[in-house]
């Protein structure tokens, strides 16, 4: 099983053109209802967009807000989300580094945020504090924000375990989507034969054998 600790530095850090990697072909059936969990609703697709709704809460067996040692005294509550994802994402030549805030959405309809807190930027490092280092995240990789909105700040561990080997490693379906429209995968989480760590660019992305760019979260055995 994967060790949770290596995910402390995971982020969608930039978008840029990369060389092809011929090791994998990801599943691009993003309009297939089986790509998503039962927590999303009103899934619809056209040639340009994937759209769906969610209430912002994961499966009921995900144990939320446990393992947090630096609580902000918030509690996850239902929200009304509507997501619209482009089906024709484009890569930027110049990389873009996100700041604290949302950077994507998971396939269970829960927002994915940058790993940083909204704390002040460290003048020496140029970075904000890490939510994981600050002890603000639960065992699933998320917490409730100031609006009682649950969201992930690192790889969504409980969601990936819920999706399982079949979807993640065999069918190679995404675990989420970045705000730029590119899918997020977890190849190598269960099966080291799918480990693409050495093939990723500085944005934690790569291009598959059919020309589809995707991001991948870090995993170790």
Range-by-range predicted roles:
Residues 24-133:
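Solvent-exposed N-terminal domain segments of exported/luminal and surface proteins
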Residues 1-11:
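Bacterial N-terminal signal peptides that target proteins for export
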Residues 130-133, 147-196:
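Short helix-loop boundary/capping segments
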Residues 105, 143-147, 207-209:
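Extracellular/periplasmic catalytic domains that process cell-envelope and extracellular macromolecules
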Residues 10-19:
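Bacterial N-terminal signal peptides
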Residues 135-138:
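A structural motif
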Residues 198-221:
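Long, compositionally biased interface segments
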Residues 89, 116-118, 154-158, 188-190, ...:
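A mature extracytoplasmic/lumenal domain signature
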